């Protein structure tokens, strides 16, 4: 696949969205497989993937279309930052969807704060690690796939 043919934002969205779906699917999948409701899959796998894809599309262009000298450390840090941005996007999305699908929840803002706190505590280190690896991998792949001399 030639990264020059696909928009860099699309490549970043697919890379980070795929990494998020993989991480959350492995984390929550064993529990969700036993349940038959689709809302659980949406809340715990779909929304994190969507949030990561949007964050990747917004902030990941430099990883998918690298310019200048290669720097894997910066790519890792950018990827980790994209993962954290995805958490900040996911929290209000999750809180809103819970309010819509589960009657009785009254405060989207309060649930957003809870999701940020517990999401950061439970999965924060994994988000940073997986996001950093996704950023580093995307940067490395784009460097190898782009023609010599950059563009």
Describe the function of each predicted region:
Residues 1-151:
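Juxtamembrane/disordered regions of integral membrane proteins
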């Amino acid at each position: 696949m030639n990264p020059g043919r696909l928009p860099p934002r699309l490549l970043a969205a697919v890379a980070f969205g795929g990494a998020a779906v993989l991480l959350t699917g492995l984390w929550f999948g064993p529990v969700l497989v036993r349940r038959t409701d689709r809302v659980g899959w949406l809340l715990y796998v779909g929304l994190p993937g969507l949030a990561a894809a949007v964050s990747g599309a917004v902030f990941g262009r430099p990883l998918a279309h690298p310019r200048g000298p290669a720097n894997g450390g910066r790519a890792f840090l950018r990827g980790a930052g994209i993962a954290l941005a995805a958490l900040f996007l996911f929290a209000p999305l999750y809180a809103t969807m819970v309010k819509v699908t589960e009657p009785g929840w009254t405060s989207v803002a309060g649930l957003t704060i809870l999701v940020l706190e517990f999401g950061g505590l439970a999965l924060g280190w994994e988000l940073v690690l997986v996001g950093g690896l996704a950023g580093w991998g995307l940067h490395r792949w784009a460097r190898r796939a782009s023609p010599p001399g950059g563009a």
